[in-house]
Amino acid sequence: GDTRRQIL
């Protein structure tokens, strides 16, 4: 997944 941003 994307580790560039944190999605809660």
Swiss-Prot record:
Q: How is the cofactor bound?
A: Binds 1 Mg(2+) ion per subunit.
Q: Give the enzyme's EC designation.
A: 4.6.1.-
Is-annotated flag, keyword Magnesium? yes
Q: In which tissues does this protein get expressed?
A: Expressed by the venom gland.
Q: Which GO terms describe its cellular component?
A: extracellular region
- Which GO terms of type biological process are on file? killing of cells of another organism; lipid catabolic process
For activity, the cofactor(s) needed are: Mg(2+)
- Location in the cell: Secreted
In alphabetical order, the GO MF annotations are: lyase activity; metal ion binding; toxin activity
User: Is Transcription one of the keywords?
Assistant: no
Keyword annotations from UniProtKB, A to Z? Cytolysis, Dermonecrotic toxin, Hemolysis, Lipid degradation, Lipid metabolism, Lyase, Magnesium, Metal-binding, Secreted, Toxin
Question: What exactly does this protein do?
Answer: Dermonecrotic toxins cleave the phosphodiester linkage between the phosphate and headgroup of certain phospholipids (sphingolipid and lysolipid substrates), forming an alcohol (often choline) and a cyclic phosphate. This toxin acts on sphingomyelin (SM). It may also act on ceramide phosphoethanolamine (CPE), lysophosphatidylcholine (LPC) and lysophosphatidylethanolamine (LPE), but not on lysophosphatidylserine (LPS), and lysophosphatidylglycerol (LPG). It acts by transphosphatidylation, releasing exclusively cyclic phosphate products as second products.
In its UniProt entry, what is this protein called?
Answer: Dermonecrotic toxin LgSicTox-LOXN5
Source organism: Loxosceles gaucho
